[in-house]
Each structure stands twice: as structure tokens, then as C-alpha cells.
Amino acid sequence: MVTALYRRYRPETFAEMIGQSQVTEPLMTALRTDRVNHAYLFSGPRGCGKTTSARILARCLNCAEGPTDTPCGVCPSCVELSRGGSGSLDVVEIDAASHNGVDDARDLRERAVFAPARDRYKIFILDEAHMVTSQGFNALLKLVEEPPDHVKFIFATTEPDKVLGTIRSRTHHYPFRLVPPAPMLEYVQKLCDEEGVQVEPGVLSLVVRAGGGSPRDTLSLLDQLIAGSESSTVGYERAVALLGYTHGALLDEVVDAIGAGDASGAFAAADRVVQTGQDPRRFVEDLLERLRDLIVVAATSPEAAAAVLRGIPSDELARMGAQAAAFGSAELSRVADLVSQTLTEMTGATSPRLHLELMLARVLVPSADDSERGALARVERLERRIGVTDAAGPAAEPETGRAPAPAVAAAESRAQAAESRPQA
């Protein structure tokens, strides 16, 4: 039986935590200066390190060399609270989701009176603290306000607003946050290197995106991909199928067809989405993500685009550069708006395929869009056909909800006249 990745690589010190410097640095400072409070409230999304940080804080407080911001890792307390340790008698973890009543609070209050069995402090970690009832919190109120010198409380919750206000006011509140993509990508790459696992280009970007900034969710998905791989290499095809994302080749096909005005190719790709059992909503969401990337590529230099779009292979970035050039800024903006509007319309829709195909029809026919944005897209398309370039740079974004400006209409008329003139 193999232990899950998120358990094997659970941090044991604050220095090993990623993306939570707003929490770890103040806590380490408090430990170094001996200004530790009697009660803490850790809040934030699931899987971002709240319970892990509570255990690390308990190790720091009860370390034989402590209180210290860096536990020694060899004393009995550190060993018992380490990754895979048996647990300490003086560190009590309570699942508040199932121990949330008055009787449980009274039992905790009675246990807090007794001195620690061996260590410096008796520490109570209440996970899912928002599940404690008002009566349970009220039973704990006096103890949390004025605990014995040997007692520390750490509350962990995903919903701090549901924790009784009088309890919150007696704690030091540290909000955790989701980990940004860049450090998460670096972390999972390092983990794969330590595990001796090879991943094909683009796989880790999908894993980080699917994890949504939660280290635990990200490692669970990576663990699933590694377990389902026949060799020590995680393939892109299997990752796309398992995570439910649209294959990059299919997105390239649709984008190329839209850029070239190829209705047959675009509708054939949409049909393949349905025939292969993919979710049309997921396809539209992935298409919007790709259009966002193309807008970044079109608006910035290759170096800046590579810095923003981390994890995308260089050959794919080059291909996206060619796709962005085939559209133009105004056309990309218009298409992205239509795709975003369709994604909103598909929420709760009974026929998502119909919305997908209608979206493609609107995207492929700019003349159906009578807004100023649509007029600019038509002008840009005509200028590209006759080889006219914009020497003054990209125009300012027009205000929506107004009739096309006279300058836009005049420019469109000139472009149409130039297109109709016979070529020399």
C-alpha cells in the first residue's frame, strides 16, 4: 500500500510551507521573540495548510529546544508529531464537525485543567471549528478567554464568519490563501523529480490548473495520474482524459478554423466534442482560456508572454503567436466577449450543444454583430486582406452601447472600396 503524496510530503516546518508567507513569517517571529498567544484561528480554503500549520506550531511550542521557530526534529515531541508519527498525548486534535455540542465542550474544559503529561503545553487543535454550535462555543468561552498557562488553542476553519464573534475576538486570526500557479508549478516539478517521475510537456500546467491553488488537491490529482501511468512517465493524453480538459490539438483546430473563417472546420470540431462525450461547457471554458492566452501573446512581447503564461512549452507559445497574428487584437477581443457571453448562457442550459453551435455562428460572421466592436473587427479583417497595417498602433477600446463612430464607418467604407478596386 502506497501512502498518498500529500501525506508523504506534508511540511514539518514553517520553512517548508509554500505560498503562505503572510502566515508563516509572523508566526516564526512570534516564536523567536516569545510572544506566542494563547489562542489562534487559522482560516482559508480547503487543502491550503491550516491543519498542517497547527501541527507545526504545536511542534515548535513543545520542542525540547523550544519554543522555537525551527523544531529540532529529534526530541520525543517532534518525532511523535512528525510526518507519520504516532501523535502526542499533549497535542489533542478534535474533529469539531462531530464533537460540536455542549457535552463535548464540557469534556474539553475538564481535560484542560490537567497539566501536560510530558511536554511544555497541552495544545488543543479544533479542526472544522465553524461546525461547533453556539452553545458549544459559549461553554468554551471562559476557558478560551482565560486558559491555564499550560493550555493553547488552535482553531482551523474554512468559514471564519461562522465562528462565534466572541471566540474570534479572543484569538489571533491568520487567513490562509490559495497558492499562486508559479510556486505551485515549481513545487510539483520538484516533487516529480524527487519521485523519479517524468511528465510530458503541458501535464503539470493542467494539474496545477485543476488543483485550483490547493496544494492537497493538486498533489491528489498528481498522485492519481502517477498511479494510472503504465510507466514512470505521465502522458499528456491520459492527463487530458482524466482531468476532463479539452485536448490542445482540438483547441488549436478550432482556433485556426475561426481565424481562417473556416465554418466547416469549426463545426466539425464542435461535433467531435459532442461525439467523444466531452462536456460542451468545459470546451467553451477551455476555449475562453485559450483566447485569453492569445490576447496576452498579441499584446506583449514573446519574453513577457512566456513570463505570464508559465508552464506552456515554447513550441506551443510560438504556435499561439501565429494564431494571434491571424486574428488581430480587435477580433480576438470580440471573439472572447462572445465566448464569455455563451459560457454564461450555458449555465443551466438544457441544450449546451445548441449554444455552442450558435456561438460559432456568431463568431464566424462578424457582420451579425452591429456593435462598434463588431465594426472594428470587420475593419481589421478587411485591412488584413488588402495588406493595410496600423502604423499608429492599436486603437483605444471603444465604449459599448453606442452607435459606430463616424470614423469607424468611414474607415470601413474606405477598406471596402479598396478591396473592390481591381489589383494591378
Task: Give residue ranges: language-model regions.
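Serine/threonine-rich low-complexity intrinsically disordered regions
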Residues: 32, 64-67, 301, 385, ...
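Extended, largely alpha-helical regulatory/partner-binding modules appended to the mid-to-C-terminal parts
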Residues: 76-89, 100, 104-110, 117-120, ...
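Residue-level marker of regulatory loop/turn positions in helix-turn-helix DNA-binding domains and
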Residues: 67, 243, 247, 406-409, ...
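P-loop/Walker A NTP-binding region and its immediately flanking N-terminal helices
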Residues: 1-173
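General helical structural elements
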Residues: 11, 50, 59, 113, ...
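Short, solvent-exposed coil/turn linker segments
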Residues: 13, 95, 235, 279, ...
